[in-house]
Design a protein with these regions (language model features):
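N-terminal targeting signals for export/organelle localization
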Residues: 1-41
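Short pre-active-site segment immediately N-terminal to redox-active cysteine/selenocysteine motifs
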Residues: 59-62, 66-70, 112
């Protein structure tokens, strides 16, 4: 009889522990997702529809990150671009997904990604293909 009670109590503790662990892990996942969304919200994603307004007609120097969601180097480069956006309010940083805006990729002759293009006064002033350090990226914009 005591063995049955101990087994039942053990099972109850195990189930309660698993429920608590599940809730904890679920909340941790939500925190990680919200941090990703928070940082991603700072950089505007530009499309063919709003490119002229947001980039060509901008009063600021614009840094364009041409990327694709499936591109590994683009994902690795993204935190560098985000850091430049956060630390340099005088630069407008935007992202263009080459899969969604193929016409812009063609217009700006983006053959490899990531490609970074700098626009000043509506005209391309500089470009680089591949990943760069934060300091090189800032230097490129100046």
């Amino acid at each position: 009889m005591k063995n049955k009670i101990l087994i039942i109590v053990g099972i109850v503790f195990f189930v309660v522990g698993m429920i608590i662990l599940s809730i904890y892990l679920n909340n941790m996942n939500k925190v990680e997702i919200s941090k990703e969304e928070e940082s991603a919200m700072e950089i505007m994603k530009v499309t063919s529809t709003n490119f002229e307004e947001e980039v060509l007609n901008s009063d600021k120097t614009v840094l364009i990150d041409f990327y694709a969601d499936w591109c590994g180097p683009c994902k690795a480069y993204s935190p560098v671009v985000e850091a430049v956006a956060e630390e340099n309010e005088d630069i407008k940083v935007v992202k263009v997904n080459v899969d969604d805006a193929q016409d812009l990729a063609i217009k700006y002759q983006v053959m490899s990604i990531p490609t970074t293009v700098v626009i000043k006064n509506g005209q391309e002033s500089n470009r680089a293909v591949g990943m760069m350090s934060k300091s090189d990226l800032i230097e490129m914009v100046k």
